[in-house]
Swiss-Prot record:
SUPFAM superfamilies from the UniProt entry: Ribosomal L27 protein-like
NCBIfam families documented for this protein: L27 (TIGR00062)
Similarity annotation: Belongs to the bacterial ribosomal protein bL27 family.
Region span, Disordered: 14-34
Organism: Exiguobacterium sibiricum (strain DSM 17290 / CCUG 55495 / CIP 109462 / JCM 13490 / 255-15)
Stated name of the protein: Large ribosomal subunit protein bL27
HAMAP family: Ribosomal_bL27
Any Pfam family: Ribosomal_L27
Propeptide: 1-9
Keywords of the record: Ribonucleoprotein, Ribosomal protein
PANTHER family found in the cross-reference section: LARGE RIBOSOMAL SUBUNIT PROTEIN BL27M, RIBOSOMAL PROTEIN L27
Taxonomic lineage of the native organism: Bacteria, Bacillati, Bacillota, Bacilli, Bacillales
Disulphide connectivity of cysteines: none
Amino acid sequence: MLKLNLQFFASKKGVGSTKNGRDSQSKRLGAKRADGQTVSAGSILYRQRGTKIHPGMNVGRGGDDTLFATATGVVRFERLGRDKKQVSVYPA
């Protein structure tokens, strides 16, 4: 009598898991209006975390540190001393 000896081998190697492959959604921070641009009151000028840029004349700061125009006018990004920056809105 014939004895069959069948052996099956794995066609694919066992695949391990990876610890990569995740990323958070971008928060779209940064300047929303350019220097010299005309804005109306309430327009968002700069979205930021912390006070990278400080509010100047006719600019308010929101709870999440967003800078917005409190009056209609022209946007100006300015230096405050050696290491600070501010954004102001001057009436047109």
